[in-house]
Amino acid sequence: YCKEAAERGIENVQILSPFREKGEAASEQLNRAIRERVNPFRSAEEEVKIGNRTFRVHDRVMQTKNTEKVSNGDLGFITGITTDSKGERLVQMDFGGDRKLTYTPEQLAHVDLAYATTIHKAMGSEFETVIIPIVKAHTIMLYRNLLYTAVTRAKKKVILVGHKPILFMAVHRADISKRNTMLGERIRLYCKAYHTERNALPELQQAG
């Protein structure tokens, strides 16, 4: 993730996980781990704690509830954190265009970190690079149609990180949808394109 984000920009790289909470490769756990790498603690003035959650200036975030100016699933960045005359912490966010908003602590209940998100939350969105963890803990959710949704969020590059047997299981697993039967061919074509560009067959990065 760090390498791709440095090359393409954080806004163009997205980790997509089948689960939000289950396992070390779930989106919530990945968000905390990735954030410590790309946006570590600098000062107390540049972060705010809401319950057991922490937000920092420069964090990548997602809106999780529709409002007048932003929709559920919209992505943005925290651009500043201030304190008003009553001592309340206020968080400035930029969702692109003229959507520069200030959030109270109560409104942050509808905001999540978004370095990683669930595949479901990413439906309808596209990113230059998509990184997908393929691990045993996600087996129960890894059907062909879900993997297809994740792979097709990528405009330029897909990185699969994990275990090949789990990937093959997901590609061939019985599916309730008929429209995703070309997933195996799509992954093969990604591999062929990668091979042509790098002159070497790609290997799945082995999970540590």
Where are the language model's segments positioned?
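Conserved helicase/translocase motor-coupling segment
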Residues: 1-72
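C-terminal accessory regions
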Residues: 74-208
